[in-house]
Structure formats: C-alpha cells, structure tokens
From Swiss-Prot:
Keyword Lipid biosynthesis: no
PANTHER family noted in UniProt: PRIMOSOMAL PROTEIN N
Enzyme Commission (EC) number: 5.6.2.4
UniProt organism field: Buchnera aphidicola subsp. Acyrthosiphon pisum (strain APS)
One MF annotation (Gene Ontology) recorded for this entry: ATP binding
Cofactor note: Binds 2 zinc ions per subunit.
Any one of the GO BP annotations: double-strand break repair
Protein's name according to its UniProt entry: Replication restart protein PriA
Catalysed conversion reaction: Couples ATP hydrolysis with the unwinding of duplex DNA by translocating in the 3'-5' direction; ATP + H2O = ADP + phosphate + H(+)
Subunit structure: Component of the replication restart primosome.
Cofactor: Zn(2+)
Length: 726
C-alpha cells in the first residue's frame, strides 16, 4: 500500500494521512479526492511512501486521483515549503490560495493535443465512384490519399470534423493523438528600432553577463533613461527565448505597461490580477505553465506562477505595502521575488523612487547592486505648502487657508482632498435635546470622545478636557455618544462648498463604475469638482485632471507608535505626483498638520527622500532597530482576553528558555493589546520579539511552536506569526 500525506484547504499546521492502492501513481503537487469528516474534500499530495504491513483500520482510503502531473513547478514547491518553515504559517491555505479558483474543484486540465488523420487500407482500396453523391467525403478522401491531415490544418483545407468522424465510423480513416509540445523558442521582433547610449549598454551587459542570481536597485533615474534601460533589458532577455515577470502593486499599472510594451515588441503578453474572470485567469495560468507567453504582468501572487522558463523578474515600487500579505501567512512579495530569482539563478530588478530602508541597507552591504545611469544631484522640489492647524480657524477639518485656496483654484481645475481613515470616522459627544455637539474653543472643530478615559480631545490643537456632565447650551443632562461617518462628512462638505460638485470615494464597494473607469483605472470626469478620497483608495486610481492635492491631516504619522510611520509617509508623499500621471507640470500640494516644525517633515519637504532616509537609518542603527536587528510579532485572537494573555505569557516563557539553548538574547515585549481590524468580534493581543540574529530567532521560534502546540490553550485561541512586521 502507498501512504500519502495530504494538504487540505484548512488553516491547520498539520498533514493528513491516507491510504492509496499500489496500482495508483500519486504525483507530489497533484490533486486527490479524500474523505474528511462527513464529506469529500479536494486535497494536494505533499509526499508519499510505500509500506507493506499497514494497519488499514487507522487510515482512510482516498476516493480518486485527479491530476496526472503536478500543478506546481519544483521551484514553486520549494518556495511554498520555505514560506511554511520561515513564516510559520499553515501550508493548506497557501497551497490553495495561489491556484486558480477553477482548480479548487475536481476540474481536470485538458492537455492540448494535435489530432492526425490518416487513410486506412480499406480507404485506399475503396472505389471512389461510391462517393459521387457525397462530394465532401470524396474531397477529404482524395486529400488523405496524398497526405496525413493535422487538426491545425482543418481551416487551411476547409474540412469539417463531422466529415472526418463519418469516415472514421466507416473505417476509411483513423485518428492518432500526438501531445502538443507548446513551448517553442519564439522569434521576437521589435516593432521600433532601439538605440542605446554607451552607459546603458554597459549597465545592461553587467546585469545580463552573469548566468546567476543578482539583485539590482533602480532609483533616482529620469523617465527617459528608465524607459531606454527597460526596453534594452526586455529585448535582450526575450531574444534568449525565456519568460519575463513584471510585478506591480496596483492593477492600474498593468494596462499602462502592457499597452506600452505592445508598441515596441511583437511578443505574447499576458496579465494576471484579481479582477480577471476565473476562466481568463485560468487560461493565462495554463499559458504561463506551458510557456506560451513571453511577458507576464501581474500583481503580488503572480510570483507563484509555474513558469516554464523564467529569465527575469522586475518588481516595480518595491517599497509598497501592498506587497505585504495581511492574511495569516504574512510574507512579503519583495522577499519572495528575491528568493525566486536566487533559486532560478536569474537577475531581479527592484524599482522605486523611494526604496525601503531595508533595500537601501542591502545596497550598503553589497547584497544588492545599485544601477547608476546618470549623475543625480538634483532634489525634486515638490510644490508644497504646510498649513499650521494650531494657528488656523478650522471648519470640519479644513483650514480657512485651504478653503480659500480651493475657491481660488477651482475654476477649470479639479481638487483632490485625501483624508486619513482615522480622520473620517470618529465619535463625538452630542446633546440629545438640542443636538449641540461639543466643539474646541480654540479651532472650533469637533471634540472627539475617548470613552475609556472619559475625556474630550481635539486632534488639531491637542487640547483635552474632562467629559462634561451636562450640555453647555441648554443645560440638559441627556448626553449621547454620536458617530461621525460618511453621511455626516457629505453634509458638512456641501455646507462649506454649496455650489461645487462633489465625488466621494470612501469605500471600494460604493464606487460608481461610470465615474471611475475600471479598465483604465482613471477618474473619467474632466470638469471642475472636488474629489474626497481615503489614503488607501487614492493609490488604486489615476486622477489626470487634478491640479490641487491636499492631505487633510497627517498627525497620525507623528503620533504613531510604529517607528516606520515616517518612512511610510515619506514614500506616500514623494509619490503623490504619480496620481495624476502627468510628467509636464506638478500639482500644488497642501499639508495640514499640528506639527509644521517637525524635523522629519522639514527634511522630507526640503531635502527629499534620500536625505531623510540617511538620517532615519542612523537613528535606527543607534537604537538597534531593523534593519540592524530582526523583529517578529506573535498575534493571538480570542473572544476572551484571558485566553490571549495566558497563551502569550506561556509563549514568552518558552521563548526565553529556548533562547538559552542557542546562546542568543531575545528582547520580548508584551503581551499587549493589538489594534487589528480583522475581526470585530474578537480581542487581539500581541507579543513583540527582537533578536540580532535571524537564524537564531527562526530556530527558537520553530522549537517554541512545537512545544506550545502540546498545551490545550493553543487550541482555544487563533494565533499567527508576523515575521518582519510593518
């Protein structure tokens, strides 16, 4: 009998064992149908081995074998195994999440065959006068007497499969099936002649000359040189007859890149993203597996595609947080891209105007090479204006300076107001009798209420007062907590700008497809208006007619407990001009803040991202923060907070004991509350772990996980680990 270890689509850190008869041939990475509880479930074969004396009472038998070949390439299987070991996540969810949805069922992939029809002995000897009235059959027989007919030639000779079937029934011809080898070295031709200067040619030679892994950072390069470099690189790789993967953070980038490349190259280009239909995604997945395409442009999960022969990976906006998975398995696509390039022994290009500090640190330590195409001493001065909220009168979060500027610039222009999600939805204290809302006496904006501490506070003036007992307007004691949400924002904005048309994009679900074009991902209206959008949604679309952008409140970055917050703000702010997709004129950008004299803000606005990054790296080095150390967070979720604290406290003790074995010092903080918006009905707590060695930390975690799984408390909470958290 064959014992098979099966992965099921369940978030559990274990394999399930089943029995299979000897005459079956299981494939690692292939699907099988197995009984699980009271139903049949699709599973994936992880491993198998033969054993003669098996107690069959302890195992269930598999129901059916679905695939005859693996759905995953050897490279993808290696990457999944690496993720499971290093990110300490359940393999089941990961194996199924990277497959097309069609393959989550028992759908069988049909291999492409070429049919070959040839004439039989009976057909050769038959008198053709018999077919005088059957002219179509006679026509086919005459061709078959001369040569074989392939299924690819049916259109050429204008032959129907029905006629061939009739001849087959009469035993006048027979059909043979030959498996089609779909990948052929394609002859790639450029539609336009490309000319490169000496510098670009030297850099291209450096990138491609080694037949091994290399990581390259492309930054601080003007658009003209960048386009020339990429065209030369793609052309050189395509001539080798291999495939190229271009990874982008947002779907809006895909169509732009595909349209641009189609202008220059006569190559097969496929796109991969979540907005594709299941059938289209599956067909592109099969084409990639068979090597029928030359270039694949896709979002994060495209890194798991089973390429036949991958030759180059290009990762655009490598700093973007969209590449970080927010599910239980918290991997970073950038790290997986580097890992895949290393295993495939190919180059990877990391492209960003604002590279992450981790990547810049890798450049300093020569783990990543810097591509220098031109002398770049110039700092891109962004047309910005900082508004001090402490000295301004405020109307529902908008300063009078900004309101006046909007009225000045409104004629013939569009205004984009970018709200932070923390500013959009908050709670205030309101009188139930006269509907009066408590306001700040300094800036006249609403006081927010903190129900846990019984205080009112103004986020603009940083004033806080004790929660009042009665209404100052009417003297009533009936005070209620009222939520300010999307509807209240709309009413207030219409009262401030009564004659100006508004468009609100506060939620992905409520977006009007006629206003925001889902194909080009552009704001379709060109007439003057005010667009109100969140920081999260604004990056998913282009706003080509916008001339004035305002960041309503950025104070959350200065007050954040996350030491990376200013790095994220700098990256977001520097890349704001890309929202308009205009290279000719930059927009006016207004920043509203209560901290106009902040050192980091001044550095970013006056000297640019790289000057800020140098100082940020020096600060992190002095405090031994990443990238000079390695952090991990263990999250625990439960409906009872006690279970979380017991589990994480136990985890802390185990970690500290195991760290002595490896002679490494662990700095552990927690358990503390974690503010995650994954599940509103559960409490989240976290345990922060920091270590100077990644290998030691990984070994300690692996052993600690094995121990913690023995205790029943690990079954009462839902826990997961975030390696290198953001």
């Amino acid at each position: 009998m064959i014992i098979v270890k099966v992965i099921l689509p369940i978030p559990i850190r274990q394999y399930f064992t089943y029995l299979m008869p000897d005459f079956m041939c299981p494939i690692i990475g292939g699907r099988i149908l197995v009984p699980f509880n009271s139903k049949d479930v699709i599973g994936i074969v992880a491993s198998f081995y033969k054993k003669n004396n098996v107690d069959q009472a302890n195992f269930k038998h598999i129901k059916a074998l679905i695939d005859t070949e693996s759905l995953y390439s050897n490279m993808v299987l290696d990457i999944i195994s690496w993720i499971s070991n290093n990110y300490h996540c359940p393999a089941g969810n990961l194996f199924f999440s990277i497959l097309p949805k069609i393959l989550h069922s028992d759908y069988i992939i049909k291999n492409k065959y070429i049919c070959q029809w040839s004439i039989t002995k009976k057909g050769q000897e038959l008198n053709l006068n018999y077919f005088k009235r059957r002219k179509k059959q006679l026509y086919v027989l005459l061709i078959l007497k001369k040569k074989h007919i392939l299924s690819t030639e049916l259109k050429k000779y204008n032959i129907s499969k029905i006629i061939l079937k009739k001849l087959e029934i009469q035993e006048l011809c027979k059909v043979n099936l030959n498996y089609k080898i779909s990948f052929k070295r394609k002859i790639i031709r450029t539609k336009k002649k490309l000319f490169f200067n000496k510098k670009i040619s030297i850099v291209l030679n450096d990138v491609l000359k080694k037949q091994c892994f290399s990581s390259w950072l492309l930054t601080r390069v003007n658009l003209y040189l960048k386009v020339k470099f990429y065209l030369g690189l793609i052309q050189s790789v395509l001539y080798k007859g291999v495939q190229i993967l271009i990874l982008v953070p947002y779907i809006k980038n895909i169509n732009t890149i595909a349209f641009f490349l189609e202008k220059y190259f006569n190559a097969s280009i496929d796109v991969m993203h979540s907005k594709l239909t299941s059938s289209k995604y599956f067909s592109n997945w099969v084409r990639t597996k068979n090597g029928e395409n030359s270039i694949v442009i896709g979002t994060g999960k495209s890194i798991f595609l089973p390429f036949l022969k991958l030759g180059l990976i290009i990762l655009l906006e490598e700093h973007n947080l969209k590449y970080k998975s927010i599910n239980q398995c918290r991997y970073n696509i950038r790290d997986l891209g580097i890992l895949r390039a290393y295993k495939e022994k190919i180059p990877i290009i990391l492209d960003s105007e604002t590279p992450s500090l981790k990547t810049l640190n890798n450049v300093l330590h020569r783990k990543c090479f810097y591509i220098k195409l031109n002398k770049y001493n110039h700092v891109n001065q962004i047309n910005n204006n900082i508004i001090n909220l402490k000295t301004e009168k405020i109307k529902f979060g908008l300063s009078l300076t900004l309101i006046n500027e909007i009225y000045k610039n409104f004629t013939g222009k569009q205004v984009l107001l970018i709200f932070n999600k923390f500013v959009l939805f908050f709670f205030v204290l309101m009188c139930q009798k006269c509907n009066e809302i408590f306001k700040c006496t300094n800036c006249d904006d609403y006081f927010e209420i903190n129900q846990y501490r019984n205080i009112l506070f103004c986020k603009f003036c940083l004033i806080q007062i004790k929660k009042p007992i009665f209404c100052y307007n009417c003297g009533s004691f009936s005070l209620i907590v009222f939520k300010i949400g999307a509807e209240e924002i709309k009413k207030e904005m219409h009262s401030i700008f009564p004659k100006i048309p508004f468009f609100f994009f506060l939620n992905e679900k409520n977006i009007n497809k006629n206003i925001l074009n889902t194909k080009s991902f552009e704001f379709a209206i060109s007439s003057p208006c005010i667009i109100i959008v969140t920081e999260e949604l604004v990056q998913n679309y282009y706003f080509p007619h916008v001339k004035l952008i305002s960041l309503i409140c950025i104070d959350n970055y200065f007050l954040s407990f996350n030491y990376r917050a200013m790095e994220y703000f700098a990256q977001f702010y520097i890349n704001l001009n890309q929202l308009t997709r205009s290279t000719k004129k930059s927009c006016k950008i207004f920043i509203q803040t209560s901290f106009p004299n902040d050192i980091n803000l001044k550095e970013i606005c006056n000297n640019g991202y790289f000057s800020f990054s140098k100082k940020a790296m020096a600060i992190r080095k002095s405090f031994l923060l990443p990238p000079w150390s390695f952090q991990t967070i263990v999250y625990s979720a439960s409906t009872n907070t006690k279970y979380n604290i017991i589990f994480l406290s136990l985890m802390r003790k185990i970690l500290q004991k195991k760290s002595r074995k490896y002679n490494c010092f662990l700095w552990v903080l927690g358990p503390n509350n974690a503010f995650l918006s994954i599940n509103k009905h559960k409490y989240f707590h976290q345990l922060l772990i920091q270590c100077s060695s990644r290998v030691a930390l990984n070994n300690v975690l692996n052993e600690s996980i094995d121990v913690i799984n023995i205790f029943t408390i690990s079954k009462r909470v839902k826990w997961f680990i975030d390696i290198e958290p953001n």
